[in-house]
Regions:
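Acyl-donor-binding surface of acyltransferase catalytic domains
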Residues: 4-9, 103-187, 326-331
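Active-site/acyl-donor-binding loops of N-acyltransferases
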Residues: 138-157, 234, 288-342
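A conserved beta-turn-beta hairpin within the catalytic core of GNAT-like acetyltransferases
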Residues: 72, 77-90, 97, 255-265, ...
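Conserved acetyl-CoA-binding loop-helix of GNAT-fold acetyltransferases
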Residues: 92, 98-111, 137, 269, ...
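Conserved beta-strand-loop-alpha-helix junction that forms the acyl-donor binding cleft
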Residues: 97, 122-132, 270-274, 300-312, ...
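Conserved GNAT acetyl-CoA-binding A-motif
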Residues: 85, 113-126, 290-303
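Conserved beta-strand in the GNAT
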Residues: 58-62, 68-77, 87, 235-237, ...
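Short amphipathic alpha-helix that is part of the acyltransferase structural core
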Residues: 1-51, 170-217, 341-342
Length: 342
């Protein structure tokens, strides 16, 4: 049967088109995501695809065989920052590999990155996958190793959480925690955006990128899109009482269409305020809040740099266990196109 490649604008494509793409993603998830996870519902994927940020471009492509999508590619590009970088993906249905479909569907993805002036390109590949060899042949480097870890929420040691709170209240007497729920109150908006820049101190290993800045306008767009994606987003922020300065925070996102799941996002403390137990205090307080307000949550997933020993230590103490090791491969776009002949 003949095939064709078409772009897909997920913000406007017919629902029937997105259902066909979703069916391929279900196959992809079963192959690449943790074994036994419930499938992502189409309704969740639909709202995620529909609601893109104003500061991002995500061109996608589908290789069709009749009414079925058998391969896909896409590329994420920030429109405000890190304008040299592009982050892409290619997936071919297992039953259709070995026919150059991957190369075919990758070509328009690379074209988009090139047209947008990107010089560096990255892929994320699960450790041990055969695609790692292809990345090597393309001249890419393993730039960043990430650990995806999971906490079985019902098995969390609540006495340990209480202990972390107690210890922090004794050690960090000059600080208090402030609970916030998206959208962030106007009075905290600029200080909170400034606080997020502390994430620029997190390990990047050999991944090449610039520091990122989030403006209040960007943050408000994130909040609007999170709500459209049916996500509750919660924060605890550590505040220095004497100065009122915000010095640390932790963030959790809860997809309402997947009520068993919580995503642990950023947790960071200003370097000038570390070694007082603020990180553990923030995470323990959030866990206690989730137990009270979100009783359906059974699993909390998070991503960390493999080299981020302090945060991994906290997570291990809480009971997080690695479920995936993912390597980000990065290279020169022109070089990898030449070596892959695509």
């Amino acid at each position: 049967m003949s095939t064709r490649i078409e772009p897909i604008d997920t913000s406007a494509a017919p629902e029937e088109t997105l259902r066909a793409l979703h069916e391929l993603y279900l196959v992809r998830d079963e192959e690449l995501e943790p074994i036994g996870d419930p499938p992502v519902p189409f309704e969740q994927r639909l709202v995620d695809w529909r609601n893109l940020l104003e500061t991002e471009a995500i061109p996608r492509f589908a290789l069709w065989e009749g009414t079925r999508v058998i391969a896909t590619s896409g590329v994420f590009m920030d429109l405000e920052q890190n304008l040299d970088n592009a982050f892409g993906w290619v997936y071919v249905h297992p039953d259709h590999r070995g026919s150059s479909h991957g190369r075919s569907v990758a070509a328009p993805m690379f074209d988009e990155a090139e047209t947008s002036g990107r010089s560096r390109f990255a892929f994320q590949i699960n450790q041990g996958r055969p695609e790692e060899r292809l990345a090597e042949l393309a001249g890419m480097k393993p730039a960043f190793t990430g650990k995806r870890s999971r906490l079985s929420f019902p098995e969390l040691d609540w006495s340990l959480m209480d202990l972390w709170v107690k210890r922090a209240e004794e050690r960090a007497v000059d600080y208090e925690l402030v609970f916030m729920r998206s959208p962030v109150d106007d009075e905290y908006l600029q200080p909170f955006c400034d606080l997020t820049e502390v994430m620029n101190t997190a390990p990047r290993e050999d991944y090449e990128e610039e520091d990122e800045v989030i403006t209040p306008e960007m943050w408000r767009d994130i909040e609007v899109k999170d709500e459209a994606k049916c996500k509750d987003v919660l924060f605890y922020v550590a505040r220095h009482v004497a100065t009122g300065a915000l010095v640390g925070y932790t963030e959790v996102a809860l997809p309402r269409l997947q009520p068993d799941l919580a995503w642990q996002g950023d947790t960071a403390v200003d370097p000038a305020h570390r070694n007082l137990g603020l990180g553990r205090w923030l995470k323990a307080a959030m866990a206690l809040r989730l137990r009270e307000e979100y009783p359906t949550v059974t699993r909390i997933d998070t991503h960390n740099a493999g080299s981020n020993a302090p945060m991994l230590s906290i997570n291990v103490e809480m009971g997080f266990s690695p479920i995936l090791i993912e390597t980000v491969w990065q290279g020169d776009l022109a070089t990898l196109r030449q070596r892959l002949s695509v």
